[in-house]
Amino acid sequence: MEQAPEDQGPQREPHNEWTLELLEELKNEAVRHFPRIWLHGLGQHIYETYGDTWAGVEAIIRILQQLLFIHFRIGCRHSRIGVTRQRRARNGASRS
């Protein structure tokens, strides 16, 4: 008779803890790129729609991920991803 293999992998942190850490990281990143009043409004909408549930947590994670993805895709001025650094003369003169 076949037996299930023993779990020999490393211990994983609980899903709920990981989800809350992800939400915290997304919130910290979002406040660097979006007005707080927008984020507050989003939080209010999620709370009114889902209440204090895991479905609400999952919804706000999904929305924040989409917002940040689109924001970076369009071209965030704060992002250094894919931007080559160019030095400019302070007086506007170009170097040839």
From Swiss-Prot:
Single biological process term from Gene Ontology: viral penetration into host nucleus
Gene3D superfamilies given in the database record: 6.10.210.10, VpR/VpX protein, C-terminal domain
Superkingdom of origin organism: Viruses
UniProt-listed Pfam families: VPR
Places the protein is found: Virion; Host nucleus; Host extracellular space
Family matches, as InterPro entries: RetroV_VpR/X
Positions carrying Phosphoserine: S79, S94, S96
Misc: HIV-1 lineages are divided in three main groups, M (for Major), O (for Outlier), and N (for New, or Non-M, Non-O). The vast majority of strains found worldwide belong to the group M. Group O seems to be endemic to and largely confined to Cameroon and neighboring countries in West Central Africa, where these viruses represent a small minority of HIV-1 strains. The group N is represented by a limited number of isolates from Cameroonian persons. The group M is further subdivided in 9 clades or subtypes (A to D, F to H, J and K).
Subunit record text: Homooligomer, may form homodimer. Interacts with p6-gag region of the Pr55 Gag precursor protein through a (Leu-X-X)4 motif near the C-terminus of the P6gag protein. Interacts with host UNG. May interact with host RAD23A/HHR23A. Interacts with host VPRBP/DCAF1, leading to hijack the CUL4A-RBX1-DDB1-DCAF1/VPRBP complex, mediating ubiquitination of host proteins such as TERT and ZGPAT and arrest of the cell cycle in G2 phase.
Role description: During virus entry, plays a role in the transport of the viral pre-integration (PIC) complex to the host nucleus. This function is crucial for viral infection of non-dividing macrophages. May act directly at the nuclear pore complex, by binding nucleoporins phenylalanine-glycine (FG)-repeat regions. During virus replication, may deplete host UNG protein, and incude G2-M cell cycle arrest. Acts by targeting specific host proteins for degradation by the 26S proteasome, through association with the cellular CUL4A-DDB1 E3 ligase complex by direct interaction with host VPRPB/DCAF-1. Cell cycle arrest reportedly occurs within hours of infection and is not blocked by antiviral agents, suggesting that it is initiated by the VPR carried into the virion. Additionally, VPR induces apoptosis in a cell cycle dependent manner suggesting that these two effects are mechanistically linked.
Protein name per Swiss-Prot or TrEMBL: Protein Vpr
Lineage, opening ranks: Viruses, Riboviria, Pararnavirae, Artverviricota, Revtraviricetes
Gene name linked to the record: vpr
